[in-house]
Amino acid sequence: MLKVGILSDTHCTLIPQLFNFFKDVDELWHAGDIGNIETADALANFKPLRAVHGNIDDHVVRMQYPEDLFFHVEDVNVYMTHIGGYPGHYMPEVKYILEEKKPDLYICGHSHILKVIYDKKLNLLHINPGAAGNSGFHKQITFIRMVIDGKTFKDTEIFQLDRNSRSF
């Protein structure tokens, strides 16, 4: 059993509530637009970090974190990238990868819109955790934690905070 925290689009901002929400997870998975290497290091010093770079990340972050990441945890094959779309609206190159690699879990960011959708056609769970940072057009700061037990995804919880609340 593995407890994971899933986030994206921090854009150099780590709100204090993030650390409390993720305090009991085993790993953090960041789907890009980290912002800078200091943000990545802060996350990696807090919990083991798996991450991909995003379109706003500089060369230092890009040298440390790949564009695409494939890995296996429990009995689940995971594919993570920053820009990729969602069921019925995948980017062509991502759709090709999903059809060829057949991951059980596909994670992306970029849109700043939280989505958790099961794709019946490709038999995978798609997660976009939304935006964990405060830069962008989104109205809510969001991120996710869940448990992976064998091939089962369970105990999924969403953190959501109105950006205008200024309680961070």
Residue positions per predicted region:
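N-terminal active-site segment of His-dependent metallophosphoesterases
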Residues: M1-L49, D57-F70, D75, K139-T142, ...
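Residue-level detector of flexible, active-site-proximal loop/helix-junction positions
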Residues: H11, P87, G133, G150, ...
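Short active-site segment of divalent metal-dependent hydrolases/proteases
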Residues: C12, N36, G85, I113, ...
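Conserved beta-sheet core of the metallophosphoesterase superfamily
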Residues: R50, H89-T152
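Helix-adjacent hinge/juxtasegments
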Residues: R50-E100
